[in-house]
Amino acid sequence: MAALQKLPHCRKLVLLCFLLATLWEARAGQIRYSVREEIDRGSFVGNIAKDLGLEPLALAEQGVRIVSRGRSQLFALNPRSGSLVTANRIDREELCAQSAPCLLNFNILLEDKLTIYSVEVEITDINDNAPRFGVEELELKISETTTPGFRIPLKNAHDADVGENALQKYALNPNDHFSLDVRRGADGNKYPELVLERSLDREEEAVHHLVLVASDGGDPVLSGTSRICVKVLDANDNAPVFTQPEYRISIPENTLVGTRILTVTATDADEGYYAQVVYFLEKSPGETSEVFELKSTSGELTIIKDLDYEDATFHEIDIEAQDGPGLLTRAKVIVTVLDVNDNAPEFYMTSATSSVSEDSLPGTIIGLFNVHDRDSGQNAFTTCSLPEDLPFKLEKSVDNYYRLVTTRALDREQFSFYNITLTAKDGGNPSLSTDAHILLQVADINDNAPAFSRTSYSTYIPENNPRGASVFSVTAHDPDSNDNAHVTYSFAEDTVQGAPLSSYISINSDTGVLYALRSFDYEQLRDLQVWVIARDSGNPPLSSNVSLSLFVLDQNDNAPEILYPAFPTDGSTGVELAPRSAEPGYLVTKVVAVDRDSGQNAWLSYHLLKASEPGLFSVGLHTGEVRTARALLDRDALKQSLVVAIQDHGQPPLSATVTLTVAVADRIPDILADLGSLEPSAIPNDSDLTLYLVVAVAAVSCVFLAFVIVLLAHRLRRWHKSRLLQASGGSLTGMQSSHFVGVDGVRAFLQTYSHEVSLTADSRKSHLIFPQPNYADTLISQESCEKKDFLSAPQSLLEEEREETFSQQAPPNTDWRFSQAQRPGTSGSQNGDDTGTWPNNQFDTEMLQAMILASASEAADGSSTLGGGAGTMGLSARYGPQFTLQHVPDYRQNVYIPGSNATLTNAAGKRDGKAPAGGNGNKKKSGKKEKK
């Protein structure tokens, strides 16, 4: 009763132990199953999902698969149920031969986590193989003299099954002479022997037919048979005998072919023919006869094929010795193959990637692989390594699995790919190794902005360049690849002189070549400051910029411009004054020119091209000063014409010319007296023009006559008052004067008081001259006279009026003349002679002020011929020579006031009623004009 109570407790204890063992195996990462051989394909083996503690759906999502090496896939995973099933036919005998138990090992890989689980499946045997003999019929020869008890070894049967399904017993059919005895060998196998129970008599029965049956222990029992034919021989009653029934040797697997490994010997007690022994290898179904060879006469056992420990660890060889008549004996040779390190480790790549991003974090898994060595023992112990200078390391997992992971951040710009060499080495002596190569590409990210080769650029463009010409190119390099390295170029938005930069230059977005969109002019634009932007095509794009300075180079495209003497607007030509008393080197005038170019293109030189009197004047090469080269002579003409050329130093040089008219005279009256000689002798006769002018002048004359009468009345009234007051004239010091004074300037003052009557040289017609308003401060030459408007009038009227005018005009004051300081030249360069006189009454002062203010107003409103202000010769302060008026010239002796018998002269002359001293010369000239 107590025993019955303890029974449940024992069961619980056994169950607990089994559970603990299962948990231990699971903890150790080992899953074990058992399955019979030859079961149908798709048969259930075990529930992997349950044993791993995962749901079937999670198992499928994590990517589970079976990893095995070196054999066909025998098992498969059902992704829906998570169960392990058979995938192919399983033959235990093919997989494990006689080994027991038959264990198959493989691994389960979870690809999501790269986790390995070991699975072991035991293949259980079924009785699917019957015992088989090597030969179906065996012939034995026994001498009739053989005594009872003689044993004859028989060929044993082979059963591929193991355990109870293996060979269990032998049986011999009943007979009177033979019995069967079964012995167990050292290898555990059963070997049948035929035992002679009774003496044979050949004459009674020459041949005995026996049947040997081999049976296994399966259910049902399977068996195999072999027929034995025993022939009874005469007289030879001794069979050969081996020196030992079983031979054992051990040889390394690298033993060379042809090597003798053993010599067997059998002896026969008979003599002569009955004692001649020959040796044979017993035919067997294995590969023994293909690996070894036994020489029939010597008994030498040699190798005829390479041994391989990995294919077979030992070989069992059956040998026979037979004498002449046919008596034989058998023995066994057990050859043990010793392992040598003849197999290098092998790589089995389970999972590997060919590309990794350069921004991957350290610890990123690159690949998973297994290392296996087919050798055994220390020869199969493997280690795996890789070069130390690579940013990778190996992490060992179970069952010689390794993970290749990164150790630091990667940079594609330093290394775009890695050729990783994995080295597996075994523990043999000498050690063998195997290399595996993994080509890993580093995928690019846009982590580098384009970079210019220089921090700034500068280039030079000649002006007047053709539109669309290439002027420069910039290049930026991006160390990234593909789109991340594709650089496009553009300009930063900017304006130049109020216009967008894009209207001046453009840039090819792909090549970085800059093109000029317009022809540059150095005088308008001398440089451009541009910011060039280089942008890659990454996401997001990166950019950088660089400054580019474009300098416009000057070309000699501007001829010199003459500032002085300027071309007058009324067609007149300026006349320079040179006194006859001028010494050599006297400064007559100065030609001033500028060139809008720069540098050597603006460097000017002056040359005298032509002169009416060669050798009289010279021109400064770099100053443009016109000076007398010798003293003036009486024979020198009054009018001297000079052609001055101004040339720059460009390539090719450009030039300009100016014509100067120099009047050689000491005083203004001399010039006025000889003015007729400077006028043209003929004026083209244009009848149509004369008709229009007559009508126009007649209308203007009426208006002008009324204006003159009113103005004269007003002036006489003011003059009368000034006589009563007898106010002394104030000095006008500090007042600037123009460079030179011409007849037009005087007429601008005189035209409000009178009109002039003259005769033309080519006709007897009379002309009434109404002077046009003259805005120039220069003397009038012949060219200016051609633009006067003439109106015909009766000859008698003109002569009468002229006689009245000349009879009432007082001789001019000849005391006034230009001093050396008043002539063109540097301000204050020469001392004046102080021979001029100053106005000394109110009327004289007012007249002089009116004349100066008229000239100043003309210069101020820009109508002057030279375009300058009063007293500046029409030049700016930069270019023009600085002249100051040392003495104001007295024009009073040349001014006639209608209705008065006096002329505007100094106070002394007015009181005395005489001409001033030195006026005789001028009086004679006036007399000549009256005669004409």
Swiss-Prot record:
InterPro entries to which the protein is assigned, alphabetical: Cadherin-like_dom (IPR002126), Cadherin-like_sf (IPR015919), Cadherin_C (IPR032455), Cadherin_CBD (IPR031904), Cadherin_CS (IPR020894), Cadherin_N (IPR013164), Protocadherin/Cadherin-CA (IPR050174)
Keyword Methyltransferase: no
Ranges per topology, Extracellular: 29-692
CDD domains (UniProt xref): Cadherin_repeat
Domain named Cadherin: residues: 29-133, 134-242, 243-347, 348-452, 453-562, 570-682
Region (Disordered): 798-841, 902-932
Membrane-side (Cytoplasmic) residue stretches: 714-932
Regions that span the bilayer: 693-713
SMART domains, sorted: CA
One GO CC term on file: plasma membrane
Job description of the protein: Potential calcium-dependent cell-adhesion protein. May be involved in the establishment and maintenance of specific neuronal connections in the brain.
Protein name (record): Protocadherin gamma-A2
Organism of this sequence: Homo sapiens (Human)
